[in-house]
Amino acid sequence: MSEARLLFLRHGEVASHRGDVPVTDAGLVHAERTGKAIGASVGGPVSVLYGGTRRTRETAEAIVRGIDASEAVIGPVDAFALRNPDMYLAGSRVNMVSAPEFLAEQVPCMTTQQVEANEWWAGFTSAPDRIGWWLAQEDPPGESSRDVARRLERFARSFADPGPHSGRLVVCVTHSPLLRSMLRATTDEDPGEPGYVTGALVRVGPAGQLHIEPHDPLDP
């Protein structure tokens, strides 16, 4: 097993979390500036991955534009491990959106009133910090914070295997629940909501050990 470096970043600014929303114009500018900073600091090949949603894809595309060295970049590539937590409601996988009506939209034939009658999801949607509320739940209807942290740890270690990303900085554009889960597993404390296009730098050692620390490419 060799060593690997991964930079996990939250997606760019969005106007809301009401479904699969786009990144704002300001968010795209921020992401492109971040890509430029990454390209200047790395001075070598980069891979850019994203977590399935429109906002992570648009952020990843802007980062690639900022790096401005297409011959040295793999991506953007959709990476399944970077998806939001797998959560379930009435037999359907749902994303953790901001209101009962947006949950109901994800489940065939479900009503907003039925979501509101679900004790767990009613607690989630009414919490001032929804992701913080989920982090504290030991047995949610889906992946827990620890489950997500383990997923990311295994994903990160896999980049030490010989393959197309060997010797590259791997930029992983994802979502705040994943970043907060990873950092919480490292420090035993919830770091709070990360800023847009900030996150964590992960180094994988030759024996598979992980070193994880908060990181902002524009303020390293």
Describe these PLM feature segments:
Residues F8, V171-C172:
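Structural beta-sheet core signal
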Residues E32-G39, E153-D161:
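Generic structural signal for well-ordered alpha-helical scaffold segments
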Residues G12, H175-S176:
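Active-site metal-binding loops of divalent metal-dependent hydrolases
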Residues E32, R54-E58, R150-E153, S176-R180:
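A structural signal for well-ordered alpha-helical segments within the folded catalytic domains
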Residues M1-E3, A69, L82-A104, S158-L169, ...:
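Acidic, low-complexity terminal tails and accessory targeting/binding regions
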Residues E61-V64, A156, L183:
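Non-transmembrane alpha-helical segments in soluble domains
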Residues I67-R151:
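Phosphate-handling substructures
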Residues M1-D86, E138-R146, G192-H215:
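Active-site-proximal alpha-helix that buttresses catalytic centers in soluble enzyme cores
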